[in-house]
């Protein structure tokens, strides 16, 4: 005799679905070729109101002669709650790619390193246009040639909040696997008013001789 087993969370999931309508949903892009292509093209899927409320950009300590910088943002999910609140989930990625002839997303030139920092974040926009946001998590990766030695990968995320102390989380990957995404949990699950916080993801590849390759993905809030 076959018994039908209904998980305990099924009723709650159905209840949650009744409370909101999913307007859009996509799988997060992590394929290196597709992600690098989108970054080179500057693909930005933020809604117009979020574009007005935020700037997304990449930073690095490397000089312009040492690295090219790229950003891209993917819309992961959009839903509407019964009270009219719109919830949008995004993945913004910053890429710093060492300059060199013939470099690409998968096959880097000798001695080049490409580092990625991704911020996964959520925006809530109420019917009266009040906005709040927070980090879901961050992801970090380095791609490099077989001739390159990466001693460790330093990961950090941060919320710079004008009302409270900065919330941050970090860890170091001592044994790095080339091309692997490493996930860092959010420093807090709290959502902040739009004008009170900025979101950051940092990736630093530590190289021999005290050298490093780094990139920061910054989601900076504007005042409308």
Outline where the language-model segments fall.
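Bacterial N-terminal signal peptides
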Residues: 1-3
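Generic detector of low-complexity/intrinsically disordered segments
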Residues: 5-6, 37-39, 43, 64, ...
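Mature secreted bioactive peptide module from preproproteins
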Residues: 90-224
């Amino acid at each position: 005799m076959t018994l039908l087993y209904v998980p305990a969370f099924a009723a709650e999931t159905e209840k949650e679905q009744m409370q909101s309508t999913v307007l859009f949903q996509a799988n997060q892009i992590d394929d290196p070729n597709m992600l690098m292509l989108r970054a080179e093209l500057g693909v930005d899927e933020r809604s117009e109101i979020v574009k007005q409320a935020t700037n997304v950009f990449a930073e690095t300590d490397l000089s312009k002669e040492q690295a090219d910088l790229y950003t891209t943002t993917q819309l992961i999910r959009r839903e509407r709650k019964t009270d009219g609140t719109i919830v949008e989930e995004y993945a913004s990625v910053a890429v710093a790619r060492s300059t060199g002839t013939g470099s690409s997303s998968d096959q880097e030139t000798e001695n080049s390193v490409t580092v990625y920092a991704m911020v996964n974040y959520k925006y809530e926009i109420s019917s009266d246009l009040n906005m709040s946001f927070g980090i879901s998590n961050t992801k970090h990766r380095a791609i490099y040639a077989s001739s390159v030695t990466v001693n460790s990968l330093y990961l950090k995320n941060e919320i710079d909040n004008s009302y409270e102390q900065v919330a941050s989380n970090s860890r170091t990957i001592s044994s790095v696997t080339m091309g692997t995404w490493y996930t860092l949990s959010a420093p807090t699950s709290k959502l902040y008013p739009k004008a009170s916080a900025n979101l950051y993801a940092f990736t630093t590849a530590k190289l021999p001789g005290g050298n490093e390759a780094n990139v920061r993905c910054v989601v900076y809030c504007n005042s409308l």
